[in-house]
């Protein structure tokens, strides 16, 4: 049973989140964005 609301909804897949920053992180799955990179090997990560 959920006791909190999920006001932030992904416009692409409809998945709902309780916090805006969780939705923002989720959108990288759809966009393919990888904003974090390793300083040692230069690989990018989501």
Swiss-Prot record:
Keyword list, A-Z: DNA-binding, Metal-binding, Nucleus, Repeat, Zinc, Zinc-finger
GO MF annotation: an example: DNA binding
Transmembrane segments: none
The keyword Heme is annotated on this UniProt entry: no
Pfam families in alphabetical order: zf-C2H2 (PF00096)
PROSITE patterns (UniProt xref): ZINC_FINGER_C2H2_1 (PS00028), ZINC_FINGER_C2H2_2 (PS50157)
A GO CC term attached to the entry: nucleus
Zinc fingers, C2H2-type class: 1-4, 8-30, 36-46
Top-level taxonomic group: Eukaryota
Compartment list: Nucleus
Gene3D superfamilies membership: Classic Zinc Finger
Family listed: Belongs to the snail C2H2-type zinc-finger protein family.
Record protein name field: Escargot/snail protein homolog
